[in-house]
């Protein structure tokens, strides 16, 4: 079993210590970004859309519960960019390069370092494992067992699986991209995003109720 240790922030950098047996790996966010940079634009975009979409429920809940810290307009902006991204990924619609870069930045580079903090906050409110909202939602809606395989005690565990199992990195990314392509064929972008919003609205009362207990 993989155990996640301490998390420290140095400026904007996120450094994670991952304990695997007696071996402690120092994980720097820059390493994650470097790996993502090695993908083609299309692969990075697909991977970013997939990760961002799974993050949306967490971010939506956090914006509603902590409006003094997080700007809900950022969520709406991300939703709009995500819609454009799905159109790009599914229909080969050409998007201006700067727009594509903004999609990738907002989906991965800006939000990913905050995901552990977000997941921890939501977990404290809901008294549930952080990923039950994100990957659990993906499994419930899509019956995709791979989402359960990614589950651990922190979001985007696949980044760390990729890091620890270097030889499987390309395969994991390829599987993630193929999974996302399949999801795009099953559910149109607007309907999928609305489903995520409905899911959050329906579960908001449960989260707030548990937080008061």
Please place each PLM-identified region on the residue numbering:
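Structured binding/interaction patches within domain cores
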Residues: 21, 25-35, 39-175
């Amino acid at each position: 079993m993989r155990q996640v240790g301490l998390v420290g922030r140095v400026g904007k950098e996120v450094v994670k210590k991952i304990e695997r047996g007696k071996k402690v790996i120092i994980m720097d966010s820059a390493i994650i970004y470097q790996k993502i940079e090695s993908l083609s634009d299309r692969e990075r975009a697909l991977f970013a859309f997939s990760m961002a979409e799974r993050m949306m429920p967490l971010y939506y809940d956090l914006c509603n519960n902590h409006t003094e810290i997080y700007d809900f307009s950022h969520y709406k902006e991300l939703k709009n960019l995500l819609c454009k991204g799905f159109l790009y990924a599914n229909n080969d619609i050409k998007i201006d390069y700067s727009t594509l870069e903004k999609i990738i930045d907002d989906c991965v580079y800006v939000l990913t370092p905050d995901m552990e903090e977000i997941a921890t906050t939501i977990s404290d409110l809901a008294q549930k494992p952080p990923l039950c909202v994100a990957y659990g939602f993906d499994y419930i809606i899509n019956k995709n067992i791979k989402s359960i395989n990614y589950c651990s005690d922190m979001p985007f565990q696949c980044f760390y699986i990729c890091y620890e199992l270097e030889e499987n990195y390309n395969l994991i990314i390829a599987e993630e991209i193929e999974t996302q392509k399949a999801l795009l064929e099953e559910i149109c972008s607007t309907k999928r995003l609305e489903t995520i919003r409905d899911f959050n609205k329906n579960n908001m009362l449960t989260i707030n109720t548990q937080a008061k207990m």
